[in-house]
Amino acid sequence: MKALNRAGWRTGSADEFIGLKREETALVNMRLSLAEKLRGRRTKLGLSQTELALRLGSSQSRVAKMEAGEVDVSLDLLVRAMLNTGASAREVAQAIAAA
């Protein structure tokens, strides 16, 4: 990076590039961490996205969006899905803290 800076290039993070505020970056990271943990729990339980969707009263496409960390999925729904797969409140908190 130093070489790029010396050559006149400006360097920074992806967050800086797209102009995210600190709290927005934190929310993105929390969402992605919960999404990753949810997918891991679902697959460990041997559930398909459709099966998890039925347990949540949702759709397969919504579960796919949850697991992709889509911005239009609420953190509430991600937490509810984690709890539905048997995650404890502590495990949910650890996923958020890992962000």
Feature names for model-found ranges:
Residues 51, 62, 91:
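Residues in the helix-turn-helix
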Residues 7, 36-51, 55, 80:
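Short basic helix-loop element that most often maps to the first helix and adjoining turn
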Residues 54-72:
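Recognition helix of helix-turn-helix/homeodomain-like DNA-binding domains
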Residues 1-33, 93-99:
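N-terminal flexible/basic segments that precede or flank functional cores
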Residues 59, 70, 85, 96-99:
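The DNA-recognition helices of helix-turn-helix-type DNA-binding domains
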Residues 74-92:
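DNA major-groove recognition helix of helix-turn-helix/homeodomain DNA-binding modules
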